[in-house]
Amino acid sequence: MEKTKKKKRKTFTRRDFLKGFGGGALSAAVVPQLLAHDIDSLRTKKGNIPLFSKKQISLTVNEKKFSLVVEPAETLLHVLREKLNLTGTKTMCARGECGGCTVLLDGNPVYSCLYLAVRADGKKITTIEGLATKEKLHPVQQAFIEKDGYQCGFCTPGFIISSVALLNKNNNPTLEETKNALSGNLCRCGNYSRIHEAVAAASKNMRRA
Amino acid sequence: MTNFKIAEPQTIDQVTSLTIDKKDKYKLMAGGTDLLAEIKDEIIEPEVVVDLKSIPDLSYIKKEKNGVRIGALTSLARLAEDTLIKNEYPALHEAANSVASPQLRNMGTAGGNLCQRPRCWYYRDPQVKCRKKGGGRCFAFRGKNKYHAILGGGLCYIVHPSDLAPALIALDAEISINSPKGNTTIPLTNFYTLPKINVRKENILAPNEVLREIKIPLIKKEEKSTYSKFIERGTWDFAIVSAAVKGTVSGGIFRDITIVLGGVAPVPWRLTKAENIIKGKKITEDLVRKATREALKEAKPLEENGYKKELAEIVLYRAVLSLL
C-alpha cells in the first residue's frame, strides 16, 4: 500500500509528479462524501457493531483541519503522504522498526506506518512540515543544520520529530535521556553523535529563548 | 496491506457475542503494532479487524485496597511513566520501559503486549508454512535457531516475546477475561500454553474472548522486584534472555523469592527449583549460577542456542544483585 506509485518519465521531476498526484487524490478523496456511508454492521446478540469499509474522518494536521474518506487498511502515513500531500514524513521500513515515519499524535511520537488512519479521527497530528513558523525554522531544525545532524537526510524528519517530542517534555535532557528518546529512530549513515549534539544545541537555544 | 473492514464495537459484550464461524475471519486489535505488521507481512489476512479502542474506559491504572487494576488498553508508555507502578512494582515499570521504542510504547498496550505473537523468523516469513501456521514441521528445529527456545519446545521452538509477562507473573498478577461463557479471572501464569497443548496458539484466548484487565496484588512489606533484560543490540530489541525477580531480602539473604525467565521457552518460565536453592542462603555468584544450572537441567538446547543456559545464569545473577 505504501509502495510508491510507478513514475512516468516526462519532463516533471519525481517530486513534482508525486506532489501533483497527491493533490489530485486529495480533491478526489474529499469530494465524494457519499462514500462515507459505506457502512455495514455485524449483528450480535448484544446489538449491532458498526462495520466500515470506508470511513469519513476529520483530523487536524499542523493546525489545519482536514475531512476525508479513508479505507480501513490505509495508514496515517499513507494518508499524510498520498492524500494530504505532506511528503516530509518518510516511508522507510513501513513496519514499525526504523522511525522514518514518526509524527506527533496529540503531542506523542508514534510510527504513522502502523497507525490506521481511521483511528486518527479527531486527533491532532504534527508532521515535519508543521514545525517551522513562517520563515523561521524550529530550533531543532536549525540545530540539525548547524551541527550537521544528518548525512543523506532521509531519516532526518523522523529524528527531528522525536527530538521535538523529547524537548517538549524535558527541555534539558542528559545525553542518556536523548539517546533513549531517539532509540526508536534509525540512521543508516550512522550519524548518531552529530544528531545528539544537535539535540543538545537545540535544548540550549530553547532554554535561552 | 491487504484490505479489511473495521468493526467498532461499543461494549466488550458485543465482541464476545461475535460468532466465530470461519478461521481468522475476525482479528481483535488493541494497539495494532503487532497485528498490522502481521497483516502487512501477509502472515494473516483477516476480513474484519475489530478495533477494541472504540470501546470506552479500557485504559486505566487504579489503586485499590487489595492491589492495582490495569485496563488492558492502557498504553505501555503510561504504564512506564506511572509513579505508583514505579514505586511499588519496579519489575513491571522496568519491563514496560524496556519494551520496544518510545513510539511503540505510545501505541502498544499492556493487554496487547501479553497477547503478541512470536518473533520466530520462520513464523514471520510469509513464504514458510511452519507448524504454527498449519504446516507440518518446525523449521527452527534443524534450521537457524540462535534465538529459539531451550525449554518447553518439541513441536515448536518459539520463545514468548512479552516483557510484561515474566514481570507480571513474578508479581502474582491475575487477568480478567471476558468470554461468551462468562467472565473469569485467572492467574496470568495459567494464561500461557505450551505448543503441545495447541501449536497454533500461545495462550488460551479464543478469537472472541477479550483480555480485559490485569490485577496485581498489594506488595508485602519490604518486598522488592526487578526485571533484567539482555538484548543483543545497544538499543531496543526483544529479550534474548530476561529475568523477573520478586522477593523479600535482608542481610544478603532472600526470605522468599519468585523467579520467572523470559526468552527461554514458548511461555514465561518459572524457576521454582532455583527459588528453593536461593531461599535462605547468603547470595553469591556461585549460588545463583548453581541454582540456575540446577533449574535448567531439563533444558534441551538446539544447535545454536546453548549459550542461553549460561546467559540465564548471568542475567539472573544481575537481577538478584540489584535487589540486595
Per-region residue spans from a language model:
Chain B
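C-terminal structural segment of proteins
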Residues: 1-324
